[in-house]
Amino acid sequence: MAEQISSAKAEARTVRIAPRKARLVIDLIRGKSVAEALAILEFTPRAASPIVEKVLRSAIANAEHNYDLESANLYVSEAYVNEGATLKRFRPRAKGMASPINKRTSHVVVVVSEKND
């Protein structure tokens, strides 16, 4: 018989926030219950918070809808940010010069799993 699936995943790819900044927020929720993680994200004043919150809510919805998991029993088992494509731009400087500007993007991944009590 097939093994029961007990985790669900959600990804946001090519999000316009630097991975270094997104990792500060992702590190706060790893290992927490989903209710606690949502509360943390709601009150964290960082630009990455709404993005990570949206991905977390998507992972919870995937768990409930696709795998019939109970949201009260879920916790954030994996949460990480990988580097996406970098948009390269130039800022004009004095005397006809230009400085490079790297607009970094991120791939945000959140996996929620059922607690084994």
From Swiss-Prot:
GO MF annotations in UniProt: rRNA binding; structural constituent of ribosome
Annotated Gene Ontology cellular component terms: cytosolic large ribosomal subunit
Single biological process term from Gene Ontology: translation
Presence of the UniProt keyword Ribonucleoprotein in the record: yes
Keywords associated with the record: Ribonucleoprotein, Ribosomal protein, RNA-binding, rRNA-binding
Signal peptide: none
Pfam family, one: Ribosomal_L22
Keyword RNA-binding: yes
Family membership noted in the UniProt record: Belongs to the universal ribosomal protein uL22 family.
PANTHER family, alphabetized: CHLOROPLAST 50S RIBOSOMAL PROTEIN L22-RELATED (PTHR13501), LARGE RIBOSOMAL SUBUNIT PROTEIN UL22M (PTHR13501:SF8)
Assembly behavior: Part of the 50S ribosomal subunit.
Function, as annotated: This protein binds specifically to 23S rRNA; its binding is stimulated by other ribosomal proteins, e.g. L4, L17, and L20. It is important during the early stages of 50S assembly. It makes multiple contacts with different domains of the 23S rRNA in the assembled 50S subunit and ribosome.
Protein name as annotated: Large ribosomal subunit protein uL22
Organism the protein comes from: Lactobacillus acidophilus (strain ATCC 700396 / NCK56 / N2 / NCFM)
